[in-house]
Amino acid sequence: MQNTIYEYESISNEELKNHIINTTELHKYFTLDWKDLKTNQYCGILNFNDQDFYILPKIANHNDEKNLNIFIYMLMYAYDVKLLNENTSLSENLKSNNILEVFVQMFANGLLQELKKGLYKEYLTKQDNLPVLKGKYLINENLKYNFTKNKIYCEYDEFSENNSLNQFFLYTVKYLQKFVKDKKLLKQCELVFDEVEYKQVDINRVETINFNRLNVRFKISFEIALLLLKQSIPLFNQDKKSFAFLFDMNVLFEKFIARMVKEL
């Protein structure tokens, strides 16, 4: 396998080395000691000049493909990610796609399968100036806004798909399109959300989204989406578009062991 680097190893590719040094967003993932640039505990993929560079944990000595498969298995097990096609092996998935592409397709396929069962809706409280009374009459707002009697300011509940969970998914499917070549599944998901308002999402606040018996079927898709949003790093350096998809191996190993213990 070409373009493979291992954790805590020096980077010999001069172009890649200069790219990392000149890209501020990447500095926390590498260590520069004098002129020697080394990887640290972060593993994953770094795309630069249309080339994929894999940073892998050294588990099986001198076997790049085996190390990559073990790394991805750890990711999938720790985060409970299912293969896009369970009849297709992980190696076959990776022959034509990089690791980020594979994870995005898994996310999009899982989300689309749930959306085909029905879009999640919930009751949202709204206030509006309407020609007829709907819900609760708001005295103060009517005195403030309505000088004539042809409108009624009221508050009511509406069963709507335009809720925070669907807004999160819409943001995610649009955002991830910039990282992948095959956008088909993401665009199919996007079409389902045509009545949902697009909003910029703060990924540090989305954990406040609550799950119940009506939307719990979307929880795995939500967790994978959150993983992709947090670990995908868009990079722009000298008008060249690239990205990184990196994981802290210390955190990954803890999650992997925690799930293993939970299943005992």
Residue ranges and their predicted role:
Residues 61, 117, 253-255, 259:
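A generic structural micro-environment signature
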Residues 1-204, 217-238:
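Terminal, charged accessory segments of proteins
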Residues 210-214, 239-258:
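A short, highly charged nucleic-acid-interacting micro-segment common to nuclease
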